[in-house]
Amino acid sequence: MVIVGFPGDPVDTVILPGGAGVDAARSEPALIDWVKAVSGTARRVVTVCTGAFLAAEAGLLGRTPSDDALGLCRTFRPRISGRSGRCRPDLHAQFAEGVDRGWSHRRHRPRAGTGRRRPRHRDCPDGCPLARPVSAPTRWADPVRGSGVDATRQTDLDPPGAGGHRGRAGGAHRIGELAQRAAMSPRHFTRVFSDEVGEAPGRYVERIRTEAARRQLEETHDTVVAIAARCGFGTAETMRRSFIRRVGISPDQYRKAFA
């Protein structure tokens, strides 16, 4: 690891990426000292996936609520509290539990810093839109263009919200129906699904519905009631409770911040 130097002026945003090299990076005292020094004067610190471990090693988190990091959150505890999928534009420290969530932060951080009225696309080498759907990280997930994932490897175990079902997030995806579709008993289906995805089917469905509702809040002028019905929540109150659990703010607050 080579430390080029310290910036002459305070930086606005420090981004700590994750990946396979995080464990080695955490053992580099010079790097950790650099992160501490630069983050101390930055307006915000953003971590992507296991980059949160760098922030933890540098002592930046304290009791900050942090995202799940795909099941690795338990290693933070007890010093750092963990909650999955929270989006807090007002926090100094921002967390992204994976690469896809990191793209979401990439989109929202410039808007939070310079105002809401920003284009939904930016010039970048891969031409990526700033508005990007979030998918699960396993065979249950959508194939991602350019990721090397072969769409033909998708199986009959695909849950609602993944692959061809993503457009039907509002369907009645009950455990019994999903298990029957996968030719499994409900108990076995729940166990296999949880092992591969890292969360129970019911929580996965709620997450997919929440992501679908987030996109509609950002991209349409439909009412919260209409979006809740379309995304499978049934009522606006059910959708509000889901947003509070997963996003940390209500649908109305989310729309005001990101639409």
From Swiss-Prot:
GO terms for cellular component: plasma membrane. Disruption phenotype: Cells lacking this gene exhibit reduced survival both in macrophages and in a mouse infection model. One of its GO terms (molecular function) is DNA-binding transcription factor activity. Residues 104-170 are annotated as: Disordered. Residues 176-197, 224-247 bind DNA. SUPFAM superfamilies: Class I glutamine amidotransferase-like (SSF52317), Homeodomain-like (SSF46689). Induction: Repressed by Mce3R. Residues 104-121 have a biased composition (Basic residues). PROSITE patterns: HTH_ARAC_FAMILY_2 (PS01124). GO terms for biological process: regulation of DNA-templated transcription. Residues 174-257 form the HTH araC/xylS-type domain. Keywords: DNA-binding, Transcription, Transcription regulation, Virulence. SMART domains: HTH_ARAC (SM00342). InterPro entries: AraC_XylS_family_regulators, Class_I_gatase-like, DJ-1/PfpI, Homeodomain-like_sf, HTH_AraC. Controls the expression of genes important for virulence. PANTHER family: HTH-TYPE TRANSCRIPTIONAL ACTIVATOR RHAS, HTH-TYPE TRANSCRIPTIONAL ACTIVATOR RHAS-RELATED. This is HTH-type transcriptional regulator Rv1931c. It comes from Mycobacterium tuberculosis (strain ATCC 25618 / H37Rv). The lineage of its organism: Bacteria, Bacillati, Actinomycetota, Actinomycetes, Mycobacteriales.
